[in-house]
Every structure is written in structure tokens, then in C-alpha cells.
Amino acid sequence: DAAAWPDTVGRALLQDAYGSFLIQGARATRLWCLVQAARAAIRRGRRVLVVTGDVENAGRLAEALAAAGDRPLLLHSGLSARERAAVWQSAQDSSATILVGTRMAVFAPIDRLGLVWVEGEDDASLKEEQSPRYHAREVARRRACCDRALLVLASSHPSLESWSAVQQGEMTACVYRDPSGFPRVQVIDLREYSRETPAGTLLSPPLYEGIQEALRQNALAILYLNRKGFASVLHCGDCGAMPQCDACSVALTFFRRSNHVRCHYCGRTKPVPDHCTRCQSLKLEPVGSGTERIEEAVRRKFPLARVGRVDGETIRRPADARAFSRLLAAGELDIVIGTQMLFRFGLQARAAFVGVPDADAGLHVPDFRSAERMYHGLMDAVELALPAHAGGAVMIQTRLTDHHAIMAVAAGDDSVFLQQEQAFRQMLQYPPLTSLVRLDVSGTLEPVVAQAAGRWAALLRAEVVSAGNRGTNAGDGSPLPQRSTGFGGETSSIVILGPSPAPHAMARGRYCWQILVKSLSLEVGKEIVVRTREVLDRESRRGGLRFDIDVDPVAMA
């Protein structure tokens, strides 16, 4: 019961020592808990730091704290350099008791820190992908520890790393979820409706019926699809070739309304080609479904409905987001179609019907966290629906009905997902059960990049052998010894995987190869990486070579 939280956090703050909590609950519940914790810290003469992954959420958190009687500072990348400097100075001058911001705020010069709150702790945006790389959640943990403050990680669906910390006794979990607030969830097997579903639309008869029922009730319907554009790609009907980005060697996303194709990685756009560059055929056809294509199908099926689309094409500026929010709040939309951007709005109007046309999108990518991301996205979609007792329904379309993420969402039971996913991670020896370092070698000449990556891998394997880690079979990818105690094992075995071309082997005109270093001891893994990197730094760098190190990478693809 969340009503117990004020007493819980009050007792923890009385200790004047580092402590950590993991809160799982709906957005409104987490916000209430944040306000209670902030007030308790301020009453004890301590200051509060709140960190979240995106600018919009930071603004909402600051507004909520202000409405509760506090006047927080707000720090994020949307401010000008002068505005950020002013906020930084105010934080240093102790003129405000609360600072709210995106990941950069975790470094703000706040003294007397009593509470560090990380909202949406599973959000990948908390990881800075540019050098110097850091994860704001882990920096927050270190700050709280150094300042003898209380750390609270909060989310609707905590990361596997945080759940593992709870299981190891490193954090205390507070689960504040009301089962009565869940909608009715139905799973649709797309394989059973392949003939009845219009090609490329992913809109099966049951999904259409769900939308129709919401319209009959004059209620809101939402369709969530984490793929923008009219279709994923264009492909040649004769030879199968797809238009690709010249700089990144990845397929270009097709946008019908603006009649252009765009690279998802470098952002380059160009007009839709009128023929195949490989065989000169004129049969270029869209393949796959994006939000734009779903919107077209919905408008065709429900011509009188007021339809809105939320993705990177329609919401480009804060003003666009505000305009959409006003339309929604005024009840001027019947059907909303969107990507994950839907979850950034903090929608107040919950829908009578939420449909997920393609739950499997994003699952089949070379990233061991793909199932976890899919599960989190589905749970976010479920949160958009009204409770079952108020008529709320969610329909999830999939071709993988027995996937543990789908089964967990349908059952409303996190443990179904967590147990199976942890078993997979254990079997494949991936975080959080091991530590992972990704090494990227990039340059303008592919043969030089491949040679340098091979050299780095050879140096790493030599270090493994010289360190006496015979259990890893000279670092060739053999299994790590099993740990009986999970975290904190003393075994320092290391596995070297690769080198191999990166999932997207060329980006912005640079070729990239990767090496993965898995270890039971992160310190030992980092030690051999740093030592071998120093050797490479002393060697020549033909082809504009760059050697990058990413400890605990969040994005693998």
C-alpha cells in the first residue's frame, strides 16, 4: 500500500546514511511518492535531486513539485547556455531545495543532499552515448552513497539490473500496483488472420472491431506502433534490393506524405527513387508498416473519425507537443496513432481501447535487451488504457504468442517475464549476471578497421592467458564458470567475443567493428581493456582509426 510510503521514507531519512529503494507503480503513484519523499528530506534540512530521461518529463515533475508548494530548479539541454549557467549557480548557492533535470543534472553542485530520485530508471536516455560516457542512474547511486543520502529508483517497469539488485539484498523494493487498475488484455495471433489482414496494414478484423467499439462509445482509441514512416523500407519487386543510405549502409525509411526516404541513423533525406539502382526496375514497393501507413489504413476504414499521429515526423518542436496535448485534452481526437513518443506526454486522458498492431517490432535485432524493451513498451501501452471495470481493453497482435514478454503482459504478472528473462541472461552470460564492455573500432578504411579490431582482440586474448584465466579457454567465448552467489563472486574469468562488424557496420561514412568483453569482475575486465588500449594508442592510426570503450552498454544495435 503506497499509504505506508511516507513512514517508510521518513524512517530511512532519519538514519542519515545511504539507503536505496526501488519503487514500482503507476505514474500518478510514483509522483505522489516523490512529493512525500521530497517534503520529508526538506524537513530534515536536506536538499533533493530528481533526474529523469527526457525534457518533457523533467518539466512535468518540476510542475508537480511546484504545485505541492516547492519551487524547484529545472536543468536540461533545452535551456540556453546562459540559462543553464544560472541554474548551476543557483544550485551551488543553495538558493533552492530541489533541482529537477535530465541526465546532466546528476552532476549539479548540490550540497546537503538528502534524496536522489531517478524517475524512469529503466529509460535508455539516462545513458550518455558520447564521450565521456556515463549512466545517470549509476552516477546517482554513487552521489547518494558519497553524500549519505537516500537513493530512490522509480519506474512502472524497473530494469532487470535493478530487480537483480533487489534480489541480492542491495535495494528494498516497494511495489505499489493496484491490480484493479489494469485493463482487460487480449492477445491476437496474427498467424490466424494472415488472409483477412490487408497487406502491410497489420490491422486484423478483431483490431478493427476494437476501434469501432470505442468509437461507438465516443471514447478514445490508441494504436501503439514503435515504427514511424509509411513503411519500414522500399524494396525492388524484381531483384529485392532496398534503397540504402550512402553513408551508413542501412535501409532508408519511406515516408509517403512527404514523398522522401530518410536514414534512421544520420538523418539524411532524399526524394523517393523512381527506379531500383541495382537492376533499374520500376517496381519499388513499400514493405512493412509504420505509423503513417497505419494512419492511412485507419482513415480509410473510419473516414469520419478524427485521427491524430504522434511520431518524430509530426512532433518536431515543443510547440507541436503542446498543440497535440491541447487537442487531446479538449476531446478533439477519436483515434491516436503513435510511437513511443506517446509515453512522453504523460497522457491524462486514458483510452477505452489500446491496440498494438505489431508487438514483435524491434524484437528481432542483435541486442540481448530487445525482449526487455519490448516488454517495457507493452506495459507502457497497457498503462494508457482505462481499468477493466471502466471498460478499458488492450489488444496485442503478435506472431509469438508463447513469448514470455507477451505472456507476462497478458497475465499482468512481472514474475513471468523476469524469471524467464533472467534464465536466458544466465544461459547466455549477459548483464546483469555478468559485466559487459563493448569495444568499437571505427575508421574510413574498412580493411584497416578490420585489421585493427583483430589486433585488439588478439591483445585481449593474450592478456587473458597471461593473467592465468585458463577457465575461459584463452578468451575464445567458452562459458564462464557458474557463480553460486550471483553478484560479488571472486572469479575473474573473462570471455572475448569477436571481432565482428557492428550491427550497422557503417554509419556517417565510418566503418565500425565490435569486440565484446564479458567478465564476472568488471574491474578485471576494465583493467585488461585499458592496458590493451594503451598498446593500440602507441601504434599507428591509419585510416582515421578511433578506439572507443563503452562500459555496460545500453544499446547494442
Language model feature labels by segment:
Residues 466-491:
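Intrinsic disorder/low-complexity segments
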